[in-house]
Structures are given as C-alpha cells and as structure tokens.
C-alpha cells in the first residue's frame, strides 16, 4: 500500500516541486494551499494523476483530512519580505495557528512531520556567511518580525 504525504503550501514553488518528487517516488499526495501566495498553475500538470489530490484549505483554521497520513511536509507560509509587509497577519497566523493545526493532524495520524523555514528567521545578518553559532539580528517590530 502506498504511503500518503500531506504537503502544505503545495501550490508554492517548493511545495509544488515536492509534489512532483514524491509522486515520482510512488507516494500518494494530498496537497493543501489557501492560494494567497501559491498558484494552481504550479500543480496543473498533476490534475490527471490519480495519486494526487488538491484541497483549497486555509490551515490557520481547524481542518480535517479523511485519509490516513503517513508524512507531513509543512511549507505553508508567505516567505518573502514583500509578503510580510503586504499580508503580515496572514504570515503570522500561518506560522502559529497553521503550524498548531498541522501538528494536530500529525498527532491524530501518528505522522512524521517536517516543518520548513527560511533564513528570514535570522533577520538582517551582521556577518556573512553566518556560522552555526549565529543567533541572528531580528527586529521584532521590523518587516521580518511576523515571520
């Protein structure tokens, strides 16, 4: 029996490529996205794939997936300083409420989960490249504060 992967942010750049990758490795994919920054065009080539299903879901609200889930790849979040300024509350909610709701799905299914992030969490670095010990330069009221 094929394992099932839930991919949040599936219509985004990275999420859509993860859908392609895991389908090529013979997994079933449930892709979810609220389409605030994602684009269905990134997934249009998968419409006829029987192992792929897309659900327009805002993960910042409680949601339910009927299928059994084995793995979750959590990539749902605006990930650009431009988005942080344009849609700050949506960004904040994706990282907080969205992550909490995805963790509930993982717990219910006893699924393994990978939570993605970006270097944006470190703010504007004072050193380049940043060593492993670097704690960042984050301004909590600056444009990256919502991420």
Language model features with spans:
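N-terminal Rossmann-like NAD(P)+-binding domain of SDR-like oxidoreductases, especially those catalyzing
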Residues: 1-147
